[in-house]
Design a protein with these regions (language model features):
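Charge-rich (especially acidic), low-complexity segments
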Residues: 152-164
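Hydrophobic pocket/interface hotspot
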Residues: 19-24, 30, 66, 77, ...
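Short beta-strand segments that buttress and anchor functional surface loops
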Residues: 50-57, 76-82
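Helix-adjacent hinge/juxtasegments
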Residues: 62-69, 75-85
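Short, surface-exposed coil-to-beta transition loops
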Residues: 6-8, 59-64, 85-90
């Protein structure tokens, strides 16, 4: 499964690493922090087998299958509609001195079978800006929830044309 492009966004999260990991590794956590999530339902949440369903506000339903789980550091998952193309997503906790950061990197399935020279312009003009806005909203939602311990309002950081 080769991917031509990736988009990463990193956000400083003002909580200790254990609290951050405990939250992002807990079942159903997107229900509390994801600004475009209508429902986050668990399929399986066991030691070496994690998968869930993410239903967006606009009714799009994605399945997340976790393919790598690195305790207290992060995980890698595949996400997409059932029986369709999937994007690869890496969630990483980064420690830098006394600060903790959460980094999300998405390797979108869009145009992945095209040569980079052909997919470059659509990515730069369309996919990258949309995904960057999406990832910033997700990370802001996680930070908001962990600091305030109050579930986030839907579309808190603005509507998103792909998911609202």
């Amino acid at each position: 499964m080769g991917f031509n492009q990736s988009i990463s966004v990193t956000k400083k999260i003002d909580v200790n690493k254990n609290k951050l990991w405990e939250f992002i590794s807990s079942p159903g956590y997107l229900n509390y922090c994801h600004p475009f999530c209508k429902k986050n339902k668990i399929i399986k949440w066991e030691k070496d087998n994690h998968s869930d369903i993410l239903e967006y506000l606009n009714g799009v339903v994605y399945i997340r299958n976790f393919i790598k789980w690195d305790e207290n550091k992060g995980y890698t998952l595949l996400i997409g509609e059932k029986n369709k193309e999937q994007s690869k997503v890496i969630w990483e906790i980064i420690e830098n001195g006394s600060s903790n950061y959460l980094k999300i990197t998405v390797f979108p399935y869009f145009l992945k079978n095209y040569p980079k020279v052909i997919s470059y312009i659509p990515y730069k003009l369309f996919v990258t800006p949309k995904l960057r806005i999406y990832l910033k909203s997700v990370l802001n939602g996680i930070k908001f929830y962990l600091i305030n311990e109050v579930p986030i309002q839907r579309n808190k950081y603005g509507r998103h044309s792909w998911f609202s």
